[in-house]
């Protein structure tokens, strides 16, 4: 088994695979007007996903994260998870979801082979959550998290986008929340995309502000593993949970890049904010194209840039995060 590496010595054991661009939320930082259907989109089907995952696994990838849009909107998600989990070499199957369907569907995903769960949870306060997401669904999400614990899922993470003036005063509440819960909360610095320039200027908060508050409250940064991603992890001896900071505008953010992305329509994206996508779908129709698919992936990886260009105001092809799943 080979190992995917780029020209800057970074290795890539991790694929983020979008299953759909559709989403049932209207998050103010992503899709404030809701998902707008463009014609009749045809997203990757199970047989195409199987060929795609087998190829990346053959190149050394061991972790697949299923994203959206909102991946739980796929009626065939149980089958997709089982297909991904069955691929030789895949050891971890994760999903990022808004969590509203967890109470109904999580047991099926778990039986199919799901090993890790990320839930978007931008506020612990119900009214604020409704304001940010456009939906009053926090109770269902909390019920789903309790179910995930009961099922024994070994990795449960919560994602919260930092929003100045909307949720930036909740850190003490989050600390209290993590005192007895073994979750990892990821605070994500708001990123500029093609559709959110005015929103970004109004609500962007540098992650350094949160890091300073964590250190002042007695939290300590944990050593970063050699194969870790870009998150900086913090722990506290009096808390079961941990806090991660994802700061795309930090100087060394891209040094820790360890993931590639494939869109719901089958385009390989070397970077969340890249200027181009590489069509893989034509090589996902037949098993006989496996070697050609491997060659296309490895060749294109040689074109991956050292950084994302956000400091220069570049947002690439990404109109909003729902289009590629973050």
Swiss-Prot record:
Its cofactor is [4Fe-4S] cluster. GTP binds at residues 16, 65, 96, 157, 259-261. Gene3D superfamilies: Aldolase class I. The keyword Cell wall biogenesis/degradation does not apply. [4Fe-4S] cluster 2 binds at residues 254, 257, 271. Residues 7-232 form the Radical SAM core domain. Signal peptide: none annotated. [4Fe-4S] cluster 1 binds at residues 23, 27, 30. Pfam families: Mob_synth_C, Radical_SAM. Keywords: 4Fe-4S, GTP-binding, Iron, Iron-sulfur, Lyase, Metal-binding, Molybdenum cofactor biosynthesis, Nucleotide-binding, S-adenosyl-L-methionine. One of its GO terms (molecular function) is cyclic pyranopterin monophosphate synthase activity. It is an enzyme of class 4 (lyase). InterPro entries: Aldolase_TIM, Elp3/MiaA/NifB-like_rSAM, MoaA, MoaA_NifB_PqqE_Fe-S-bd_CS, MoaA_twitch, MoCo_biosynth_MoaA/MoaC, rSAM. One of its GO terms (biological process) is Mo-molybdopterin cofactor biosynthetic process. This is GTP 3',8-cyclase. The gene is moaA.
């Amino acid at each position: 088994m080979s190992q995917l590496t780029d020209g800057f010595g970074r290795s890539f054991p991790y694929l983020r695979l979008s299953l759909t661009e559709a989403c049932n939320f209207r998050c103010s930082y992503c899709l404030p007007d809701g998902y707008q259907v463009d014609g009749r989109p045809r997203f990757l089907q199970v047989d195409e996903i199987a060929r795609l995952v087998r190829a990346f696994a053959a190149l050394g990838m061991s972790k697949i994260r299923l994203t959206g849009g909102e991946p739980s909107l796929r009626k065939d998600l149980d089958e997709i998870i089982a297909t991904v989990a069955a691929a030789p070499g895949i050891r971890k199957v994760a999903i990022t979801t808004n969590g509203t369907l967890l109470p109904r569907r999580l047991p099926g995903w778990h039986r199919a082979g799901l090993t890790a769960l990320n839930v978007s949870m931008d506020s612990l306060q119900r009214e604020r959550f409704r304001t940010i997401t456009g939906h009053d669904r926090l109770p269902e999400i909390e019920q789903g998290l309790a179910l995930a614990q009961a099922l024994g899922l070994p990795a449960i993470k919560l994602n919260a986008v930092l929003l100045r003036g909307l949720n930036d005063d909740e850190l003490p509440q989050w600390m209290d929340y993590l005192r007895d819960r073994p979750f990892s909360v990821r605070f994500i610095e708001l990123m500029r995309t093609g559709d959110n320039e005015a929103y970004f200027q109004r609500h962007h908060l540098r992650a350094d502000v949160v890091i300073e508050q964590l250190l002042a409250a007695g939290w300590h940064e944990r050593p970063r593993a050699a194969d870790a991603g870009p998150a900086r992890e913090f722990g506290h001896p009096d808390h079961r949970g941990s806090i991660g900071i994802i700061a795309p505008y930090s100087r060394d953010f891209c040094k820790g890049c360890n993931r590639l992305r494939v869109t719901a329509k089958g385009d390989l994206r070397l970077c969340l904010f890249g200027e181009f996508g590489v069509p893989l779908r034509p090589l996902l129709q037949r098993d006989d194209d496996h070697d050609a698919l491997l060659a296309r992936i490895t060749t294109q990886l040689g074109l991956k840039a050292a950084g994302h260009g956000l400091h220069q105001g570049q947002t690439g092809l990404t109109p909003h995060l729902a289009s590629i799943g973050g």
